[in-house]
Amino acid sequence: MAGAKEIKTKIASVKNTQKITSAMEMVAASKMRRAQDRMTASRPYAESMRKVIGHVAQGSLEYKHPYLEVREAKRVGYIVVASDRGLCGGLNVNLFKKVVSDVKNWKAQGVEVEFCPIGARSVQFFKAFGGKVQAHASGLGDAPKLADLIGTVRVMLQAYNEGKLDRLYVVFNKFVNTMTQTPVIEQLLPLPKSEDDEIAHHWDYIYEQDPKDLLDTLLVRYVESQVYQGVVENIASEQAARMVAMKAATDNAGTLIDDLQLVYNKARQAAITQELSEIVSGAAAV
């Protein structure tokens, strides 16, 4: 059994760690609330864009934009959004597992795969993974702006325009609630059709004046908005996962302190008993 002094030092060390994890939990909770506000504010725009584009994909246009045409899948691109920092449980690991599983399915069909990682952890993973990285972005902070992503996203759009990609997906952790964050893979290009069949079959848009000019701008903005929404969703998910992970670490530290305190008390009691035995033995010898 370790000595009482050694155990006491370990208890002090664990208490210091507990203070750090508790502080990180509170910081993550505060950041999560702000991230949730940004996510909630941007969701209606992203969802409205998705509905509009879904109707466009269903509509019968004289001008058929390249983003509406379904090509044979020979090359697939993934924009993978992960966190810049760790200490957020299995958030990034679960996301990467989902991507790798999807990539294996494509490669089994002889399809080439390229990546655009967003977030330091994503960049680090896919460079080690050995995939072809077309573009990347990291260090976006807790309150990223759309302008921070446009350059990176347009590299992938350019590759799609040039026929170097036939499918484009965005991957991120969707924020469900504080305890649940779900990794999702959403198709960006070619444009997915609206799932709302009832509305799609009852009306269509009238384009004035030239649908080409409008769609060229609208469809690019759509892709950018969906990637941005994925980033803000992932930030909210990251902070929620970190808050939960730090709470678990704080609770575990408390349990460890209690266990160490019990060991310390036993060691101290054993030391006192040993001293008393030595005193009694010495007195008997005299």
Curated annotation (Swiss-Prot):
<keyword id="KW-1003">Cell membrane</keyword>
<keyword id="KW-0139">CF(1)</keyword>
<dbReference type="InterPro" id="IPR035968">
    <property type="entry name" value="ATP_synth_F1_ATPase_gsu"/>
</dbReference>
<keyword id="KW-0813">Transport</keyword>
<keyword id="KW-0406">Ion transport</keyword>
<keyword id="KW-0375">Hydrogen ion transport</keyword>
<dbReference type="GO" id="GO:0005524">
    <property type="term" value="F:ATP binding"/>
</dbReference>
<keyword id="KW-0472">Membrane</keyword>
<dbReference type="GO" id="GO:0042777">
    <property type="term" value="P:proton motive force-driven plasma membrane ATP synthesis"/>
</dbReference>
<keyword id="KW-0066">ATP synthesis</keyword>
<dbReference type="Pfam" id="PF00231">
    <property type="entry name" value="ATP-synt"/>
</dbReference>
<keyword id="KW-0997">Cell inner membrane</keyword>
<dbReference type="InterPro" id="IPR000131">
    <property type="entry name" value="ATP_synth_F1_gsu"/>
</dbReference>
<comment type="subunit">
    <text>F-type ATPases have 2 components, CF(1) - the catalytic core - and CF(0) - the membrane proton channel. CF(1) has five subunits: alpha(3), beta(3), gamma(1), delta(1), epsilon(1). CF(0) has three main subunits: a, b and c.</text>
</comment>
<protein>
    <recommendedName>
        <fullName>ATP synthase gamma chain</fullName>
    </recommendedName>
</protein>
<comment type="similarity">
    <text>Belongs to the ATPase gamma chain family.</text>
</comment>
<dbReference type="GO" id="GO:0046933">
    <property type="term" value="F:proton-transporting ATP synthase activity, rotational mechanism"/>
</dbReference>
<comment type="function">
    <text>Produces ATP from ADP in the presence of a proton gradient across the membrane. The gamma chain is believed to be important in regulating ATPase activity and the flow of protons through the CF(0) complex.</text>
</comment>
<dbReference type="InterPro" id="IPR023632">
    <property type="entry name" value="ATP_synth_F1_gsu_CS"/>
</dbReference>
<dbReference type="GO" id="GO:0005886">
    <property type="term" value="C:plasma membrane"/>
</dbReference>
<dbReference type="GO" id="GO:0045259">
    <property type="term" value="C:proton-transporting ATP synthase complex"/>
</dbReference>
